[in-house]
């Protein structure tokens, strides 16, 4: 199992543009909608990234996204997230 970068962004196109700028290949990153939460309810786009990073269910979120088969992660630096 290899690690992928989770890119938290307001839409897929924004995440894809940022990933291309970082020279990431498609298999190296996964888009995470800033509007998504574990319950599946809409949230403000102004997600508090620090709070999101500290959530113990962040790995569950990554594993349940349709765009991700499997994401293994311990912790993400703030600079890793759009």
Tell me the role of every PLM-derived stretch.
Residues 1-82:
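Short, flexible loop motifs at catalytic/binding sites
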């Amino acid at each position: 199992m290899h690690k992928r970068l989770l890119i938290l962004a307001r839409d897929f196109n924004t995440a894809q543009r940022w990933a291309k700028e970082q020279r990431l290949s498609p298999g190296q990153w996964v888009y995470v909608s800033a509007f998504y939460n574990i319950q599946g309810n809409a949230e403000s786009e102004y997600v508090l990234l620090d709070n999101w990073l500290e959530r113990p269910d962040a790995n569950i979120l990554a594993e349940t996204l349709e765009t991700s088969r499997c994401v293994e992660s311990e912790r993400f630096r703030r600079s890793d997230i759009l």
